[in-house]
Design a protein with these regions (language model features):
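Short beta-strand or tight-loop elements
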Residues: 45, 145-150, 160-162
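Active-site HxH/HxHxD metal-binding segment of metal-dependent hydrolases
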Residues: 56, 71, 78-153, 167, ...
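Accessory terminal helices/loops
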Residues: 2-39, 203-214, 221-303
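Divalent metal-coordination and catalytic microenvironments
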Residues: 63, 75, 100, 112, ...
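Active-site-adjacent loop/tail segments of enzyme domains
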Residues: 186-212
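Conserved beta-strand hairpin/beta-sheet module of binuclear metal-dependent hydrolase folds
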Residues: 33-92, 164-178
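A short acidic, helix-capping loop that chelates divalent metal ions and anchors anionic groups
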Residues: 132-133, 185-191, 225
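Active-site metal-binding loops of divalent metal-dependent hydrolases
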Residues: 76-77, 101, 127, 157-158, ...
Length: 303
């Protein structure tokens, strides 16, 4: 609803109104704490990822090639936080990986370009992305230092949504940055697409990645998603266990990201639309697209 209202405003006014809305929403949720989660890091031999919480529930990610110290930032909606992390880690930020055009993901791009003082390549799959200077499409490839990046086109939440699949030089360390397509235990709303498109994104593309691929999503929605997953599959013990794990993490103000592709296949109803237990919930046994449509519609109004 709020996005429809803002879309009727002139571009500059729309951006200002959207920024004010998300800032106010963040203050309402987080108060004087400032942020919804503590910062955290995932460090491997070739790749480091610094998890940078932003706004009321967003995540930005600073990706570092440990061999070259070249870095990229995913969805830098809070440029000051990004620059502070870059300076703290002493890395060479070269690129911005934008998953989609929504303000809470791409709204900081132009300010980051202005503040940073060095040229940055801004990747993305949608001309509506602020600061975009390198448009990408499905299967496009580039590098972050020695790390290999492959673009996965996942239209549905938005028509130009891109996920970024990253591998170490040897291919043994793998991660995917999924924006608002795939969440821990859930998926994004179908704002600009269809159930067929989300099925293609989740089942035909992302689920085909190696099971040990780490999944870094765009929001801290885990407990709400898992609660819904338990509603869909009340006998799913993997979901129940993940709920308890997530409660412990959130009680400590820690992020629940990353998950893995293997985990999502066990706990995420939107990744399980080919499973009979999920199809039965939707009264659509043998029909995964109808199941996807139904469980998304119910989730949109689930409390």
């Amino acid at each position: 609803m709020i996005s429809r209202v803002f879309s009727t405003l002139p571009n500059r006014a729309s951006k200002s109104a959207t920024a004010a809305y998300f800032t106010y929403k963040s203050w309402l949720q987080n108060g004087w704490r400032g942020c919804h989660s503590n910062q955290a890091s995932v460090t491997m031999s070739d790749i480091s990822v610094h998890i940078l919480p932003a706004l009321s529930d967003n995540y930005m990610y600073l990706i570092i090639c440990n061999q070259t110290k070249e870095a990229a930032i995913v969805d830098p909606v809070k440029p000051d936080t990004v620059i502070e992390a870059v300076n703290k880690e002493g890395v060479n930020l070269k690129s911005v990986l934008t998953t989609h055009h929504h303000w809470d993901h791409a709204g900081g791009n132009e300010q980051l370009l202005s503040l940073f003082g060095k040229p940055l390549t801004v990747y993305g799959g949608d001309d509506r992305i602020g600061g975009l200077n390198k448009k990408v499409k499905h299967d496009d490839e580039f590098t972050i230092g020695n790390l290999k990046v492959k673009c996965i086109f996942t239209p549905c939440h938005t028509t130009g949504h891109i996920c970024y699949y990253i591998q170490s030089p040897a291919g043994d360390q793998k991660m995917v940055f999924t924006g608002d397509t795939l969440f821990l235990g859930g998926c994004g709303r179908f704002f600009e697409g269809t159930a067929d498109q989300m099925y293609s994104a989740l089942i035909e593309k992302l689920s085909k990645l190696p099971d040990d691929t780490q999944v870094f999503c765009g929001h801290e929605y885990s407990l709400g998603n898992l609660k819904y997953g338990n509603h869909v599959e009340p006998d799913n013990q993997d979901i129940l266990a993940k709920i308890e794990w997530s409660k412990t993490k959130r009680d400590a103000n820690e992020p629940t990201v990353p998950s893995t592709i293997a985990e999502e296949k066990l706990i995420n109803p939107f990744m399980r639309v080919n499973c009979e237990s999920v199809q039965k919930f939707a009264n659509a046994v043998g029909h995964p697209i109808e199941t996807m449509t139904y469980i998304r519609r119910i989730k949109d109004n689930f409390k």
